Amino acid sequence: MGNVFVLPTCLKPLNQILSPTSFIEIPLMRTIKQIHSAEYRPIDDLVTYSPLPTARLKQVDPFLFLNHHGPQTYPPHNRGLPFGPHPHRGMETVTFIIEGDITHKDTGGHESVIKTGGIQWMTAGRGLVHAEVSSEQFKQKGGHLEILQLWLNLPRRLKMTEPAYQGFQEAEIPAFISEDGGIRVQVISGEFEGVQGGYQSLTDVHLSTLHLKQGASLSLSIPTERNIFFYVVRGKVVVNKTPATMYQLVEFNNDDTTLHLESSEDAIVILGHAVPFNEPVVAYGPFVMNSQAEIQQAYQDYQQGKFGSF
């Protein structure tokens, strides 16, 4: 009988090392299609950058539109925000108050003043008129202002739903905070790490605001069937090995599930994801419908006073 020896573990035969049960599943990152820099589109004296829509990117279904106002400083005795009474139909608006405040009033009887760190979510549905202006205190005293407004589409079945509004001050928004304090996530709708958002979306949209300190890192898993909305409000981040900075929107492919985020400096990111509606979108002015005929009807209804008035 010849000499017998035992192979060290590291030299086990390949058919043992590569057994089906020995593989470790490595999550694959979503690939990035393109980085879009916002276009500068001032409104009177209001600093405004618009990353969506642009000539290169029409929508991230169902995310339709984003305006980033500021940051800027208003002097005392200013005119404040210029968004007086105007109508909407067929969509929703989500307003992020990073700094400053905003007074909301609409023909559905809703009225509020939301301050720094707060959120407003309005469902226009079948139609209403609203105004978004600065508070009297802000106009008198001035101060820092930075506000973003995101438009969300509504599917055909909900275009004519009942209008609704809900405002949240910063302290009212559920939040996830990491153990080391480097990550704070305001969960607006949907769920994040067991924290349920403050708003119940009609269309299962997830929306959150990520506040990241320099050096913080975060990994998320988002199903491939959901489109991702990712916009850098402040600072610099590296997402799936690609750098992105303030005023940039990251467009993803729907190929994998993992989102890995690292902050190069203190940063704020708006993160959303949703299943696309895959419906025709006809947007004209403040109305978002499925056909030109529906747009014409919206204008006619508004002119006939069917949206109400202040």
Regions found by a protein language model. Name each.
Residues 2-310:
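Jelly-roll (double-stranded beta-helix
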